Every structure is written in structure tokens, then in C-alpha cells.
């Protein structure tokens, strides 16, 4: 990573970074239109991987860059692109990352949003191709969306160059509306490495009947991580991601606990007797009655936990706001066992049915505890949506 000659300054990290990235390519986010893709295509904005810099790598159009970079504008206007969220939802914040764009970053951006129906989108699929600009036909198709009139979630604001200490810019959003599409404006031109949209997925639960079997914890259905003890190698929000994990980095993995005994001992059921554990608290997308649980340690072959347990509780929205002010995940939550301590194994899908569960009540939150440490790729809570009692 490039270092700026000035002294590094640590910046506070906003709370919304614990939420899901609704625009990531891994959850279906896509670029529908971009005014210009000369040096690097807009699709790079939504990549899940971290940006990289390849010294000495050039294309016929210029320096290869891992992001979206437009040509130096020599005509009136500014550059912009339209992004379709992979998971429609309520947006709580944005992250614009200009890593490695030091003398060619976009100096200013603004962000607009809309909630569109599928039939309103008439844009043709894009080609991921550098050295191009939008054609007249593509501009005409994009103009039909009237995106310049979409709601502003972020007015024009400055970005900073892509040095280590200044590349990440965070913007909080105060909106309770559901959005499906964004217009990212850069002024007037330049590059951004990654663009992330943090929020909570929101589906239409009115179309879901009481007998519909759903993964109540999935990010697509509105599940979200609220807190955790450790996320050294991978964030627990990955537990509720789409599909199975693509690698270890796509799961929740903690550091090795330093309080583990010098010599490990297990009980008759194979559960290690250790003092330490790690935990993550998540909110279901909809309260419900959980009847089946899946714990997937896919890819964690030498670093899965020995055991896992899940506690649950039911909190109404007003109670959620009240306990949020306590600053911890014990006071006011009234946790009850949902899944007793269960031994889990490396690189395996574990399925638990209702006969294995200790709680048969409507719940809204879960606390996942692993011991002593390690990694889990996915957790699914299957059941039926129900109103809170």
C-alpha cells in the first residue's frame, strides 16, 4: 500500500461497517450503465476482493488499475454510473475506497437512489470492457430512468487520495426507505477502487405465508450482525451471506485464544473443556419459529471450532432500542438456549432438526457461541415467519 509522507492519523470506524454490503458482486450487485470505462471498468467497484496494485502493468489504454477509472474529461459534464443493488434494502452508510488512486482519484462524489420495479429497467447488459465510453444508444436508454432526479442520499462531497491513511471515506445515511438502485456521480472524472453500500436487506414479507419455510437469518431476508467478540480473520456478517462460502475469507474466523490450556482435555462427548469462547449476536430478518439449523464449516479444515451453541430471545422493536442503549448484549436480552452445546467438525455441513432444539418459541435475535475459537462459514436458521407475541 502506498504511504503518504505525512504522519498517519487513525480515523474512527463507523458502526454501519458491521452491516451487510448490499451492492457487492457476490450478492448480485451489478453495474447497469457507466459514462466511461477508459482505464478500468466500473464493475471493479463492486468486487469482493481487496484492491491490488500491479507494478509495471499497462494495457493499450494506460496503467492497469483495480477500480473504476475514467479518462481525463475534455468535454462538458461529469462521469457517473448506475448500480443495481444485489439485495434491496435500507441503506445506513457508504464507503468509497480510493486505494492506489493517488494522482488520479475522483476528487468529489455524490450519490442518488431510487426504488424501481424490474419492468422499469430497460438497459441492456453491459460488457466489462476498457477503452470505451457509453454509446449514444446507451445514453438514451439510461436517460429514460431520469436518474438525475433520483433522491440524494449524499450531496457532493470530497474524497481523498488513495494513500494508506486517507483512502477510506465513510458517509452515514439517515434514510428509512427501501432502495434498489444507485447513481454514483464522480466530479468531474477520475478513479475509485471500491464502492460499498452498507445496510439491511428488506424483502416484502406480506407475500410470505405462515407456512412458507424460510431462512430467517439470511442477509437477503434482512438478517444483520449486531456485535461480536472477535473478527480477526473474517467478519461474522459473512455467516448470513449468499450460498456457501467461496473460501475461508468468506466466513467468520477469530484469532486463537491465548487462554486455551497448555494441554487440552475433553469430556465423554468430545467437547473440549476450555475456559474461553467467542460470540456473535445477529438479528433475524423476521421473527419466527426456528425448526431447523445448519452450521457449515466449509473450508475450515484445520481451524474450525470444537463446539457451538446458539441462544435466542424475542425482542419487540421498542425493546430493541432500549437494550441498544445498554452497550452490551446481556442486559435486557433474556437469552434462552436454542441449540445446546454441540460438537462440530471441520469442513462439514451440520444439520439439526427440531428434535435437537431446546426452544420452540418465536424468536428475533440469536447469540452464536463457538469454543474455543476458529472459523464457521455459514449459519442458517430455517423456520416459519411469525409475529412476536
Swiss-Prot record:
Abundantly expressed in kidney and liver, but at much lower level is also present in brain, testis, intestine and lung. One of its GO terms (biological process) is purine nucleobase metabolic process. The keyword Hydrolase applies. Belongs to the allantoicase family. Gene3D superfamilies: Galactose-binding domain-like (2.60.120.260). Its EC number is 3.5.3.4. Utilization of purines as secondary nitrogen sources, when primary sources are limiting. Signal peptide: none annotated. The keyword tRNA processing does not apply. Pathway: Nitrogen metabolism; (S)-allantoin degradation; (S)-ureidoglycolate from allantoate (aminidohydrolase route): step 1/1. Keywords: Hydrolase, Purine metabolism. It comes from Xenopus laevis (African clawed frog). This is Allantoicase. HAMAP family: Allantoicase. It catalyses: allantoate + H2O = (S)-ureidoglycolate + urea. PANTHER family: ALLANTOICASE, INACTIVE ALLANTOICASE-RELATED.
Amino acid at each position: 500500500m502506498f504511504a503518504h509522507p505525512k504522519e498517519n492519523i487513525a480515523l474512527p470506524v463507523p458502526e454501519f461497517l458491521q452491516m451487510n454490503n448490499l451492492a457487492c458482486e457476490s450478492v448480485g450487485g451489478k453495474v447497469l450503465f457507466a459514462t466511461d470505462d477508459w482505464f478500468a471498468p466500473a464493475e471493479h467497484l463492486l468486487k469482493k476482493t481487496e484492491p491490488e496494485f500491479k507494478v509495471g502493468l499497462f494495457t493499450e489504454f494506460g496503467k492497469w488499475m483495480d477500480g473504476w477509472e475514467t479518462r481525463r474529461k475534455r468535454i462538458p459534464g461529469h462521469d457517473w454510473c448506475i448500480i443495481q443493488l444485489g439485495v434491496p434494502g435500507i441503506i445506513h452508510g457508504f464507503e468509497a475506497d480510493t486505494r492506489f488512486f493517488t494522482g488520479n482519484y475522483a476528487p468529489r462524489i455524490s450519490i442518488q437512489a431510487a426504488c424501481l420495479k424490474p419492468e422499469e429497467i430497460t438497459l441492456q447488459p453491459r460488457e466489462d470492457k476498457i477503452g470505451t465510453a457509453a454509446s449514444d444508444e446507451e445514453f438514451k436508454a439510461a436517460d429514460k430512468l431520469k436518474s438525475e432526479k433520483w433522491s440524494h442520499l449524499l450531496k457532493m462531497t470530497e474524497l481523498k487520495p488513495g494513500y494508506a491513511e486517507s483512502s477510506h471515506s465513510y458517509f452515514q445515511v439517515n434514510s428509512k426507505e427501501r432502495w434498489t438502485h444507485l447513481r454514483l456521480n464522480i466530479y468531474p472524472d477520475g478513479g475509485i477502487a471500491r464502492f460499498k453500500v452498507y445496510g439491511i436487506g428488506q424483502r416484502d414479507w406480506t407475500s410470505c405465508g405462515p407456512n412458507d419455510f424460510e431462512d430467517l437469518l439470511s442477509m437477503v431476508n434482512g438478517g444483520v450482525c449486531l456485535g461480536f467478540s472477535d473478527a480477526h480473520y473474517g467478519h461474522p456478517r459473512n455467516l448470513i451471506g449468499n450460498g456457501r462460502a467461496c473460501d475461508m475469507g468468506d466466513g467468520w474466523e477469530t484469532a486463537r485464544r491465548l487462554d486455551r490450556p497448555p494441554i487440552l482435555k475433553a469430556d465423554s462427548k468430545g467437547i473440549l473443556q476450555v475456559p474461553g469462547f467467542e460470540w456473535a449476536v445477529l438479528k433475524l430478518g423476521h421473527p419466527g419459529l426456528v425448526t431447523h439449523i445448519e452450521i457449515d464449516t466449509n473450508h475450515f479444515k484445520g481451524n474450525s471450532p470444537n463446539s457451538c451453541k446458539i441462544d435466542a430471545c424475542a425482542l419487540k422493536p421498542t425493546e430493541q432500542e432500549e437494550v441498544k442503549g445498554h452497550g452490551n448484549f446481556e442486559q435486557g436480552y433474556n437469552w434462552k438456549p436454542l441449540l445446546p452445546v454441540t460438537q462440530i467438525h471441520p469442513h462439514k455441513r451440520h444439520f439439526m432438526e427440531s428434535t435437537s432444539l431446546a426452544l420452540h418459541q418465536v424468536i428475533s435475535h440469536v447469540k452464536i457461541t463457538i469454543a474455543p475459537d476458529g472459523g464457521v462459514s455459514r449459519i442458517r436458521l430455517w423456520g416459519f415467519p411469525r409475529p412476536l407475541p
